[in-house]
Each structure stands twice: as structure tokens, then as C-alpha cells.
Amino acid sequence: MRAALFALITALTGVIAQIPNSPRFDLTKPSYDLWRNKKTAAITVQQSFTFDNVNRRLFIVNRRDGSALDSGDLTISQLDFSGKVLGSMDLLGCGHGVNIAAEPVGSDTYIWSETDAAASGYGTALWKFKFQNGKTLNSATDKRKRIVPLPEFDRGTATIDPVYKRLIVRYQTGSVQNIAAFDLAKASAGNFSNPLAKWEIPHLVKELGAKVNVFQGYAAYGRYVYFLTGESYDASGGKLNSEVMALDLDTGKLVQGPVITKAGSTLKFREPEGMAIYKTVSGEVRLFLGFASGVAGDRRSNLFYKNELI
């Protein structure tokens, strides 16, 4: 009887979702400050950020000071939650830094990032390494294992859902951007044979309705993946066009948005840069949005969060 019922449900629905339902963030609700105008270990625009939810650490990635735009050289800063720089390390020839992920392993934090940057400055694979203050990793000489989760994986980046323990990657095949999700424990062990989800990202403007086709970061919590889009005031002619949206991680369908976010609207320059999920000690789950501010030669980090779930 149970088998017959399963067969009937499968026939009616077509596909059984591998990612169960969960609460999601209401993107229309206000954003709150964690900080504004904080320095990192680099003076360039922050590209993204991530949290180690177990060891309570925060990391921000920038292009390395003095490196060319297409060099793939990055600086990862560790900051405390008041914005004080605690340490940093450099990555040479690795990528653009669109997204990084932090995986706690005991008392250590391992960073997932791009590596082996092409002439474009974007990475062609992923790798994972322990954050160590003061250390420099050079992709040209470092022999640690490269991670290529799927065929034709290019310009790939990663984010981790720290609550539901999943690794989500965004990557390019040809000219198409894609999302894939994996069980974190399996992915960390090198097993990418059974993606929980895998789909092409709809065109940000033509299909999802964003104001501009400028992708600035993503984060995942439960059944949903969140995108941040938009330009700096310098690029937009002073117009605020930053938006957030929620998509079903199982299907790729738009669930909410695009919603204009006015977080940090008075900041100078104000370029959207990065998203991440953090769960506080008290259990509150937060969707963080990052923005760069300041002037060339003195860029600053700004982090805001939404915390209302529906």
C-alpha cells in the first residue's frame, strides 16, 4: 500500500523534492546594522564575506592591494564582530572573490574559495584550506587538491548553509550560470555524485526582473537561495538599484523579489558586495548583506542583516 501511494504521488508531482520545505526570510522587512565603514586588511573594495558559525569567526575577501584587476590575487581578513581586524592571509592567482565559504573543523576554520584563475581573473576550480594568519597561498605552486564538483565547471564559487549543512556552488558552463547544492559532509569528503539540486540560473533582468544584470553574491538557508544584485552609486549615476531576491533551491523558481534594499543607502559609493547566513548564540538566524563604501584607496566594509522569517 505504501509503495503504491509513493508511486501515485510521484506520477502526480513528477519529481520528489530532495530539499524539504523550511522557513524563509521576508525580504520586505527592514535591515539592521552590524557595522558601517570598517577597515579590512586591504584598502580595495570588499568582494564577499562568510561566517564560521561554530567558532564565531567572520572573514572578508578583497582584491589584494597592488594587484591587477585580473590577477586573481585576494586578501582574506578575519575580523571580530565589532569590526576589528584580527588577521589576514593572501591568495595569489585564485579568482575574483565573488563568494567564499567557511567550514568549521574543530577549532579551525577551513575556507572554500576559487583557485587557478584564468586570464579573466576568475577561478577555474575550487580548493579548501585552513585559515592561517600571515600565510600566503600561491595557486601556481601550491599542490593541494583542486575541487571540480561538476563537468564544465568554470568561474565557480561556494557558499555554505551553516544551519542545514549544505554546500551550494554557483558556476558557469559556456555562457550560462548555474546553481548546484550538495550535502556538506559528503562534499567535504569529495563526494559530489548526487547533487541535491542542479539548475540554470534564469537571466537576472529578462527572467527574474532585476533592474541590472550585475550579480553581487548569494547565500542559502534551508529550501531557499538568496541573490544580491546591483551597482555602486558611481556606476549607476547615483541611482539606488540594489535588490535582493529569493529562489527555491530545489527548483530554481523565483519565490520573492526582486525587492529593493535600502540598507546603508546614505553610504558613499555603496556597492553591493556579498551575502552570508549567520546563526547567533541565542539561535536567531540572520541573512547578511554586504556593501563597500568610501573612496579609492580607502574602501570600507559595511554589513547589514535581515532576521524576520516566514
Where do the model's predicted regions map?
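Beta-strand-rich domains and repeat architectures in extracellular enzymes and scaffolds
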Residues: R36-G72, Y226
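Conserved blade-ending motifs and adjacent loop-strand segments that build the rim/top face
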Residues: K253-T280
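A short beta-strand motif characteristic of beta-propeller blades
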Residues: K29-A41, K84-D90, D142-P149, L196-L208, ...
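Structural signature of eukaryotic scaffold interfaces centered on beta-propeller domains
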Residues: A41-V54, H96-T109, P151-I168, V214-Y221, ...
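Loop/turn-rich, solvent-exposed surfaces of beta-rich toroidal or solenoidal domains
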Residues: L208-V255
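Short glycine/acidic-enriched loop and turn motifs that connect beta-strands
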Residues: R64-L69, D116-G121, T173-Q177, S232-S236, ...
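Blade-loop segments of beta-propeller domains
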Residues: L74-T115
